[in-house]
From Swiss-Prot:
The gene is SETD1A. PROSITE patterns: POST_SET (PS50868), RRM (PS50102), SET (PS50280). Component of the SET1A/COMPASS complex composed of the catalytic subunit SETD1A, WDR5, WDR82, RBBP5, ASH2L/ASH2, CXXC1/CFP1, HCFC1 and DPY30 homotrimer. Forms a core complex with the evolutionary conserved subcomplex WRAD composed of WDR5, RBBP5, ASH2L/ASH2 and DPY30 subunits; WRAD differentially stimulates the methyltransferase activity. Interacts with BOD1L1 (via COMPASS-Shg1 domain) at replication forks. Interacts with HCFC1. Interacts with ASH2/ASH2L. Interacts with CXXC1/CFP1. Interacts with RBBP5. Interacts (via N-terminal region) with WDR82; the interaction is direct. Residues 844-854, 993-1002 have a biased composition (Basic and acidic residues). Residues 60-89 are annotated as: Interaction with WDR82. Keywords: Activator, Chromatin regulator, Chromosome, Cytoplasm, Disease variant, DNA damage, Epilepsy, Intellectual disability, Methyltransferase, Nucleus, Phosphoprotein, RNA-binding, S-adenosyl-L-methionine, Transcription, Transcription regulation, Transferase. A motif (RxxxRR motif) lies at residues 1537-1542. Its EC number is 2.1.1.364. It is an enzyme of class 2 (transferase). This is Histone-lysine N-methyltransferase SETD1A. Gene3D superfamilies: 3.30.70.330, SET domain. Residues 430-440, 593-617, 624-655, 1077-1094, 1127-1145, 1308-1323, 1404-1414 have a biased composition (Pro residues). CDD domains: RRM_Set1A, SET_SETD1. A motif (WDR5 interaction motif (WIN)) lies at residues 1492-1497.
Amino acid sequence: MDQEGGGDGQKAPSFQWRNYKLIVDPALDPALRRPSQKVYRYDGVHFSVNDSKYIPVEDLQDPRCHVRSKNRDFSLPVPKFKLDEFYIGQIPLKEVTFARLNDNVRETFLKDMCRKYGEVEEVEILLHPRTRKHLGLARVLFTSTRGAKETVKNLHLTSVMGNIIHAQLDIKGQQRMKYYELIVNGSYTPQTVPTGGKALSEKFQGSGAATETAESRRRSSSDTAAYPAGTTAVGTPGNGTPCSQDTSFSSSRQDTPSSFGQFTPQSSQGTPYTSRGSTPYSQDSAYSSSTTSTSFKPRRSENSYQDAFSRRHFSASSASTTASTAIAATTAATASSSASSSSLSSSSSSSSSSSSSQFRSSDANYPAYYESWNRYQRHTSYPPRRATREEPPGAPFAENTAERFPPSYTSYLPPEPSRPTDQDYRPPASEAPPPEPPEPGGGGGGGGPSPEREEVRTSPRPASPARSGSPAPETTNESVPFAQHSSLDSRIEMLLKEQRSKFSFLASDTEEEEENSSMVLGARDTGSEVPSGSGHGPCTPPPAPANFEDVAPTGSGEPGATRESPKANGQNQASPCSSGDDMEISDDDRGGSPPPAPTPPQQPPPPPPPPPPPPPYLASLPLGYPPHQPAYLLPPRPDGPPPPEYPPPPPPPPHIYDFVNSLELMDRLGAQWGGMPMSFQMQTQMLTRLHQLRQGKGLIAASAGPPGGAFGEAFLPFPPPQEAAYGLPYALYAQGQEGRGAYSREAYHLPMPMAAEPLPSSSVSGEEARLPPREEAELAEGKTLPTAGTVGRVLAMLVQEMKSIMQRDLNRKMVENVAFGAFDQWWESKEEKAKPFQNAAKQQAKEEDKEKTKLKEPGLLSLVDWAKSGGTTGIEAFAFGSGLRGALRLPSFKVKRKEPSEISEASEEKRPRPSTPAEEDEDDPEQEKEAGEPGRPGTKPPKRDEERGKTQGKHRKSFALDSEGEEASQESSSEKDEEDDEEDEEDEDREEAVDTTKKETEVSDGEDEESDSSSKCSLYADSDGENDSTSDSESSSSSSSSSSSSSSSSSSSSSSSSESSSEDEEEEERPAALPSASPPPREVPVPTPAPVEVPVPERVAGSPVTPLPEQEASPARPAGPTEESPPSAPLRPPEPPAGPPAPAPRPDERPSSPIPLLPPPKKRRKTVSFSAIEVVPAPEPPPATPPQAKFPGPASRKAPRGVERTIRNLPLDHASLVKSWPEEVSRGGRSRAGGRGRLTEEEEAEPGTEVDLAVLADLALTPARRGLPALPAVEDSEATETSDEAERPRPLLSHILLEHNYALAVKPTPPAPALRPPEPVPAPAALFSSPADEVLEAPEVVVAEAEEPKPQQLQQQREEGEEEGEEEGEEEEEESSDSSSSSDGEGALRRRSLRSHARRRRPPPPPPPPPPRAYEPRSEFEQMTILYDIWNSGLDSEDMSYLRLTYERLLQQTSGADWLNDTHWVHHTITNLTTPKRKRRPQDGPREHQTGSARSEGYYPISKKEKDKYLDVCPVSARQLEGVDTQGTNRVLSERRSEQRRLLSAIGTSAIMDSDLLKLNQLKFRKKKLRFGRSRIHEWGLFAMEPIAADEMVIEYVGQNIRQMVADMREKRYVQEGIGSSYLFRVDHDTIIDATKCGNLARFINHCCTPNCYAKVITIESQKKIVIYSKQPIGVDEEITYDYKFPLEDNKIPCLCGTESCRGSLN
């Protein structure tokens, strides 16, 4: 180590010492003169100085190893400055003075009371110097200002020990000393001492107070330490004269509930203004010292601020007439005073008075008459503010304003802590508005008195002038707490709560408050606008004084600030809307107001301080005021030069106002537009636009005002055109109330940015301001018109931009979030495969879509269309309650369960992801509009959207419902319930479910029409899974749903064509089949391919069935087919709505590549035939023809109507998820059993019904084989995906499905005779040249019986392993015939497994009708639902086996994707362990009533054995207490006993021991926790729930005190009534306590011959009471007993206590 001054010898070594120690330091040890340098010791041996006197350490040890050393904690407190007379700087508000305390309050109690609010440093109770009597005064010093403020806020005017205490921040205890003097002098008692207002100030004012000169005032201010001496110099006689101050201030303040009420500290800063003799008065009476006008120091802030303000205002507004000047001055003074007095929310009156006083003080020449005029103004709450606003501020005023404004802005920034605090504490009671932020020039309202403030007034003062004032000003405020009860945070919080757009935080500073007060200058009692704006530029206008409050809030010139002013700190503000409502200026008020003094103009009216007004223009309007109302239009200001009264407000700091205005605008917009929340992005955009507009135009144009252009310029944050600059903003709102151009004056009060310069034309002359309301209105109308157009255009532009932005964002959002990119890719791949069919289907679907414009994507369409259409058009749209948010609803990703019918619908709509349900609901109409625009930008693929839109459009109604989840939820809930029932009683439930399903399907059909649209809107519509799910029934109809067709591209194409046709049919059917809730509208389920479709060409051609109306198709098909028919309809190319496609076409239309969904092995036949016909390149059969051809028989059965039913074979919940076209009951087995829609065993057995595992597998593989017409794997994945899946990205699902493809696992069983006559599927056969193709061909949802698939097709399907049999719909039939060949083995196996599964799951369905009809193939939706069940219930062994089989089959297929070769089978844990619902056993609880009704059941005895099951002798509560440690309780009890003993010993005599006092003491705290329960002794007993020590009071025996005679009578009556127990307890010879019918738990105490308690009679307040005391320690759960001590009688009452010493009887 480098030695600083080491000796040469020691420094010589080149190596560095490891350790060193400073041995000698001459600087620290002056005694050692000899060493002139420091001496170091290195490594304990070597020294830096060669001196033998230093002895090295002998044993070198690591100094750190102090094994025995002890660590001691050093307290190193941070030194704090002592706040004595030498302290320089602002004294922190850490001292709280309490007054009117109960004389029992001592230091400890007070400290504990205050400690919760902050760390207490010192507590002192003031005692009388001679008598040492409690004076009710206390001083508490906190370590932080926060604690002090919180204490005042929470304890002021609260009851403590019966006294309403007074708490206030008190710098240096100035107020406390005043109270002390008043009490010690005998003037007041501790409980009557005035804690604020005039009384207190007068007490300390000298007799000469009235004549107090400016000098004396200066002295006062200096005493206050806040009042600048210079300020008083200007003090006018008015200031000096108490009468002038009192009059002006008191009048206004008195009129307004003390603006400076005890809650509002006089100093705006909120520091108690100690200097003012009037402090108490100002605080309590809401009078400032100046208000007091006693010679005693006027409010320092008022005086100095007023003086400065007056001077400035005077000079500025000198141009205006004297009267107007005086008025303006008064107004300004008032504003300033109010600002100072009431921090943020200044009372107009107070502000006016303060301004007047300032004016007077500032101008020594200020005539007394001015003062009187000011008073008059205050009393009248004269409108001069408006006038002032209208008048162009004089140049001087502008200068003054500029000077002031800088501080004002500063003050605008963070409110001074003290002030806010005071405001917070200011109770609402003080009606006077809290002082507005002091004008910048004026200095902090609180600091107004400070010379700095005065100087600032004269010259621009530094930010937070209030602060600039010496701490004294704060001290000056008597009730600092009241001066600013609201801290900035609290005010902001308050504003937020009020949802105001005003910027209270801006005006938070004292200056701001003063400025606000100035702005309030013109405030009139009548509610005329107080020209707060005059005093304040950017500052938010102080709330109008209470007097103004009474008047129409608009009256106040400040944008609500004045109106708010009535409430100090904004706490008292009458209405949260004060910014808006209060801001409305009543024309009458304006008219009545005297000409505003020029001074007020100095400061542009600040927006209402507490709530930052949105652009002041808006602020003037009541929040609730409809933005679109004409009231906004304000008459243009007179062209003449604006009255000098309004000097152009100095431009507020751009950052402040831009920011503020933007915020205001946003807030206002939010408030105006039905409170619809705006997204952060929207807000940001809006603000950006506003800012740009402001920069570019500097006009109102920038405002993204309320949607309605009605706001006009006023709405805009930017200053309106000069005319409107002042008036417009507020005028708009003001007019809202008065319908007149109140704005002119109000505008001046707007923040500076808003009222840039008073434009001569814009400013209204004072006379104008005074015009009667009509005249003003006329003026306003005339004046507003010019700007109205600009405003409207700007707003329109903004709205349009917002719409476009929102549309773009929404589209992007919808595209990204709703239609996932992966899903799109997957979809596209499918589309490519299905293109041949898609094209035809899409064309038809498009036609249908055009005819039936439906929302393509509920959320997206509605949003986009709404935006494009202009929403509600105009800002008004936003103004509507739903608001922007309502209009723009983002898609909900919430998984909604749809009933089968809904699902089918959803599948049709599947592609479009419905936006949030709520959105969908709201958007439905718009969505319908949008439906017409399927290809909307932002929707995923326009094609899909179109298709989807078409289907959705058709189903929009239901979709809307579904979007809400109402339909789906209802159906699904019912289905779920049924499903649960099924779980309990699967077989029974299944049977019931079939009926239920039929009913549900019918109901859902009806609902489906509604829910169709809803389902479309539902997420399922968007999700492919949904498409798949819906594709079954919907894909048939889904073909109609182009979206679905797009979802499974092949499917979608066919489904599109079939969609359109099916849609048409569905539409037609819907009316007819509404009961069935013809799901056809659900076009989304493209996935539902009809196996026929692949063969479509042949089938279509071959099938004689021409496209029948959907109804016809439905009839053609059995009811069940009807459900499916819609899906098949989608399959057939959508025909123009004109002709409903034949059912056959639907199957064809089903997505050519409809994904046959494998039913999850559980609960449903594992083999679910998916009528998913992969769109094979083969041309689709003619849309109409294929369905009929496909289902000649089925069609004949009944063209599937749009009736939505729960998909059979699907659990209700799945059915709800996948609404398939309700199959008509005729469908027979097809109907879902138990609402689950499972196929009957026979159905399952049938090849057609077999799940198209191969198809599923093929679907899964489809992505790989896009080129292949059939996508078994893809279809599988589609099939697998249910509506829930639909929400998930399909690509992922497909991949997962491929890995876990159980569909392919089971080869199609040999086709059993097709349930429906297998429709010839030549095209499908061709299409499904590969097994996968075949599989895809057979859509599960075959509405009509599909012609048996051509053998080759079936063979192909079988080969692919997709087994059309899975497609229980058409494919089932087809497979039943065709798959019987090769698929017979697999099909049979699968069917058997499914059948067995179905048997397990539900009772065997009735013998299936002929295979074709008896067992209609499940709709693709059913298949998907069944397949998707794996996601809900988990993977069971059957699912696993099918997955394995599918995987193996896929590997064996040559057509399989190559990627399969890279995969290997991995066993997956079985997650669906069937745990049948545990049926409640009768013995689990009380027996069930045999009759089912407790009332009709009558009474039946319950044996004790039964009761014991649910009655525990030892209640849980008691058992819980067993583990409780009784030691603590015993300790407490012992302490209490010892305390009693001490008390007794202190009292002494035994006589006293029996005194009531002692007994009462014994009773008061001794309630024990007891409970009653079954007793081993007799019936009920009383048990202890806590340990009870000996000689403790246990309980009082409570009852009715009756005489002996009454007791005898009652006893006889009780016996007659059968009341065997006696609850009569004798107190003495005359009194008996009867607890029989009225008492407490004590009556349950049983008798015991060896009791643990005894009864004692004590007298309390001349009443005898029976108290049970413990005789010995009693444990928890021990029964309380005592000896009844019945008199001996011959008739013995047996004793049941059973103790060893039992006497055997009670008497």
